[in-house]
UniProtKB/Swiss-Prot annotation:
Pfam families: DHO_dh. It comes from Lactococcus lactis subsp. lactis (strain IL1403) (Streptococcus lactis). Its cofactor is FMN. One of its GO terms (molecular function) is dihydroorotate dehydrogenase (fumarate) activity. Binds 1 FMN per subunit. Keywords: Cytoplasm, Flavoprotein, FMN, Oxidoreductase, Pyrimidine biosynthesis. Its main location: cytoplasm. This is Dihydroorotate dehydrogenase A (fumarate). Pathway: Pyrimidine metabolism; UMP biosynthesis via de novo pathway. It is an enzyme of class 1 (oxidoreductase). Belongs to the dihydroorotate dehydrogenase family. Type 1 subfamily. Catalyzes the conversion of dihydroorotate to orotate with fumarate as the electron acceptor. One of its GO terms (cellular component) is cytoplasm. It catalyses: (S)-dihydroorotate + fumarate = orotate + succinate.
């Protein structure tokens, strides 16, 4: 019922973790692999290992989360070794997603060259939208720099590649970014990363709740679902059909998943809710989505995918 075709591969269902959640270590990744998730993705890596920002840097909130992790990861080679080993052992399984988030265009190019030269046959996600590294702007808000980077990438990169985007809030920005993305043989876009630089306050303590950046951090969870749905829909209606969409943001229930698929997402990433609930969330959310589809008489996701009605 939930079978999903994406990047010329078949997945049992469209659900996966969002990079950054439950994917730091090989143990985390093995737990995801053993879960009911249709696919999983590694932690966004930099060439060298990073400790990330000082603690506390992640807090669960009533309707979501705030974080300023600062891209902590165990380094590019750690994750490349894992995916290559996994690929060798489990050739028949659905491909793994490998996330990178260089601190500069040059670092992204260096990592992509290593992936291109390796035997990795999965799907690469280039994160252009981390909002939590002090002093480092989100590249995908700079349209010229994004276009320049992608032009360079596609002079040598021939494997499946997606980009993870920040949320946009202006229709003109959707138009501009879609026009740029449509020039390239991208496999997908992932919309959205957390909404950058929100602020949550503990009114009892009269204080912020995370330490980095004076308490400013990326907001995730139910708070951002309307923004995520808008971004999925805006890109679904603007991108060429070869570029698929991964919907991320506020997916906690089967209902949320249904809405993302209705807007045009093909795969779905879960972040905040996975952090709160652990990998067992996939069992629950699959069941809930199947129940909604049964109730509506849908046999497959294709029956309603992207078919959001306008008034």
């Amino acid at each position: 019922m939930l079978k999903t075709t994406f990047a010329n591969a078949e997945f049992a269902n469209p659900f996966m973790n969002a990079s950054g959640v439950h994917c730091m270590t090989t143990e985390d990744l093995e737990e995801l692999k053993a879960s009911q998730a249709g696919a999983y993705i590694t932690k966004s890596s930099t060439l060298e290992k990073r400790e990330g920002n000082p603690l506390p840097r992640y807090v669960d909130l009533e309707l979501g989360s705030i974080n300023s992790m600062g891209l902590p990861n165990l380094g590019f080679d750690y994750y490349l070794d894992y995916v290559l080993k996994n690929q060798k052992e489990k050739a028949q399984e659905a491909p793994i997603f490998f996330s990178i988030a260089g601190m500069s265009a040059a670092e992204n190019i260096a990592m992509l060259k290593k992936i291109q030269e390796s035997n990795f046959s999965g799907i690469t996600e280039l994160n252009l939208s981390c909002p939590n590294v002090p002093g480092k702007p989100q590249l995908a808000y700079d349209f010229e720099a994004t276009e320049k980077l992608l032009k360079e990438v596609f002079t040598f990169f021939t494997k499946p590649l997606g980009v993870k985007l920040p949320p946009y809030f202006d229709l003109v920005h959707f138009d501009i970014m879609a026009e740029i993305l449509n020039q390239f043989p991208l496999t997908y876009v992932n919309s959205v990363n957390s909404i950058g630089n929100g602020l949550f306050i503990d009114s009892e303590a009269e204080s912020v709740v995370i330490k980095p950046k004076d308490g400013f951090g990326g907001i995730g969870g139910a708070y951002i679902k309307p923004t995520a749905l808008a971004n999925v829909r805006a890109f679904y209606t603007r991108l060429k059909p070869e570029i698929k969409i991964i919907g991320t943001g506020g997916i906690e229930t089967g209902q949320d998943a249904f809405e993302h698929l209705l807007c045009g997402a093909t795969m779905l990433q879960i972040g905040t809710a996975l952090h709160k609930e652990g990998p067992a969330i996939f069992d629950r959310i699959i069941k809930e989505l199947e129940e909604i589809m049964d109730k509506k008489g849908y046999q497959s996701i294709a029956d309603f995918h992207g078919k959001l009605k306008s008034l």
